[in-house]
A protein has these predicted regions:
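Acidic, glycine/proline-rich low-complexity segments that act as flexible tails and inter-domain linkers
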Residues: 1-90, 310-317, 321, 432, ...
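Well-ordered secondary-structure scaffolds
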Residues: 7, 12, 17-20, 80, ...
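Active-site-proximal beta-alpha loop/turn segments in soluble metabolic enzymes
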Residues: 44-48, 125, 163-172, 201-210, ...
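Alpha-helix C-terminal capping segments
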Residues: 49-50, 95-109, 189-194, 226-230, ...
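Glycine/serine-rich anion-binding loops at beta->alpha junctions
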Residues: 79-102, 106-118
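Short beta-strand segments
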Residues: 111, 145, 153-156, 201-205, ...
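A glycine-rich helix N-cap at a beta->alpha junction
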Residues: 125-151, 221-227, 231
């Protein structure tokens, strides 16, 4: 009996699981414009209310994946490995871990996104480097990857077009916050890259889209389940986003901090998390016998300068003016800067990371509308982490913008002040990593 969209929507509405073939049929009909938006919207709401089981989520991902181009990188030697982050504040880890893994011999075909809401995007950070071209055709994409073990580009319209259309529907039908739909959306785009393995950084906390450990674990398990069902080794880590990563928020700010780490310095949290994720990529890529060995190899690639050189070489291959990567102090800056000063002494008890991310967007580091232009120098430089003691009159942060007035910068500085919570006594810093999820289960880290 042929499939009927109304009967499939009714089944999902009533909490009945659909078969993989039924899911594939729905997506195929929708992609071919034989299923209207109103029926897909009804299906999405039914899925939101009743959930999708592992078979349904994997089938949805597979159907969206094959709605467009799936890259075949089998002619590129080695195990291709990528990393995906669910988004946070000050998250510049991709700029570090990708060249580290590449320097260790692992091909990294990284397709990244732009900023989303309060969360910064890797593409916007890369484009703060003058001339960096994230829009390469497939032939050049392969050439750069083959030459340097790394390529850094943006998503194209050819990759998972069904997901793009369905995401737009979810955005206007209040069905975004559905973990199986989120997971299928993420994995359909990642698997289209032609990778063999994937490392996932699932953020949890005030600056993450997942606010609780329970939500983050459910997402991590679903992502790993989909990846493994597709035959890709997949490992997820739950990492803390109750405070920004490092001290820099903004596009060029974060590139500069990533260069500090690639140069052997930089903040400890950024360095160690980058090495954990890169070390896992090196292990999955077959260049190390364990994650620990992969971390050691990654650390050596930073120490000997090879990881930093890979980043510079890839930037040059993608048309960037690498002068500012070799000499970050030559980057053109200007505009307005305002210091945020502590009105009382105390200990940093916490941050409203979401508010800090949105403050950076208001300064010009992100988009309030889709046609907004990014200000590459806009951002926030913090001076402390949770648990640090701060003196009265000390600078808590500096806000910078080249496209906003001094009055706007002063107002945003007050938002930043309110987002840094000071108090008496002492405060233990949060653990950077709490859990690891892989095909064998969920484990405390």
């Amino acid at each position: 009996m042929p499939n009927n969209p109304v009967s499939l929507i009714r089944k999902k509405r009533d909490g009945v699981s659909l078969s993989a073939d039924e899911i594939r049929w729905l997506i195929r009909e929708y992609t071919a414009d034989r299923l209207p938006d109103y029926q897909m919207s009804a299906f999405l709401m039914a899925a939101y209310l009743n959930g999708l089981d592992a078979v349904e989520a994997a089938a949805l991902c597979e159907a969206m994946l094959h709605s467009g181009v799936v890259l075949d990188l089998s002619d590129i030697p080695g195990v291709k490995v990528d990393k995906h982050s669910t988004g946070g504040v000050g998250d510049k880890l991709s700029l570090i871990l990708a060249p580290v893994a590449a320097a260790c011999g692992v091909p990294v075909p990284m397709i990244s996104g732009r900023g989303l809401g309060h969360s910064g995007g890797t593409l916007d950070k890369l484009e703060s480097i003058p001339g960096f071209n994230v829009n390469l055709d497939l032939d050049r994409y392969r050439r750069v990857l083959r030459a340097h073990n790394l390529v850094l580009i943006g998503q194209t319209d050819d990759i998972a077009p069904a997901d793009k259309r369905m995401y737009a529907l979810r955005d206007v039908t209040a069905t975004v916050e559905c973990i199986p739909l989120i997971a299928a959306s993420i994995m359909s785009k990642k698997l289209a890259e032609g990778i063999d393995a994937l490392v996932l950084d699932v953020k949890v906390g005030s600056g993450a889209f997942m606010k609780t450990t329970e939500q983050a674990l459910e997402l991590a398990r679903t992502l790993v389940s989909i990846g493994e069902a597709a035959g890709k080794r997949t490992v997820a880590y739950l990492t803390n986003m109750d405070q920004p990563l490092g001290y820099e928020i903004g596009n060029w700010n974060e590139v500069r901090e990533a260069l500090d780490v690639l140069g052997g310095g930089g903040p400890e949290d950024v360095r160690e998390l980058s090495l954990l994720l890169a070390g896992t990529m090196v292990w999955l890529g077959g260049k190390a016998g364990s994650v620990e060995e992969g971390i050691a190899l990654g650390r050596a690639a930073i120490d000997d300068g090879s990881a930093r050189q890979v980043f510079i070489d890839v930037a040059a291959a993608q048309d960037a003016d690498v002068t500012v990567l070799r000499h970050p102090d030559r980057y053109p800056t200007g505009g307005v800067s305002v210091d945020v000063v502590a009105t009382d002494a105390g200990v940093v008890r916490g941050f409203d990371s979401y508010a800090l991310g949105m403050a950076a967007v208001e300064l010009g580091a992100g988009r309030l509308r889709t046609d907004d232009r990014i200000d590459p120098v806009a951002g926030i430089t913090l001076t402390s982490k949770i648990g640090d003691r701060v003196a009265k009159g000390a600078v808590l942060a500096t806000v910078r913008t080249a496209t906003r007035t001094a009055e706007v910068a002063e107002r945003i500085a007050e938002t930043v002040r309110a987002a840094i919570r000071l108090g008496p006594g002492s405060q233990n810093p949060p653990k950077w990593v709490t859990h690891v999820v892989n095909r064998d289960g969920t484990f405390l880290y």
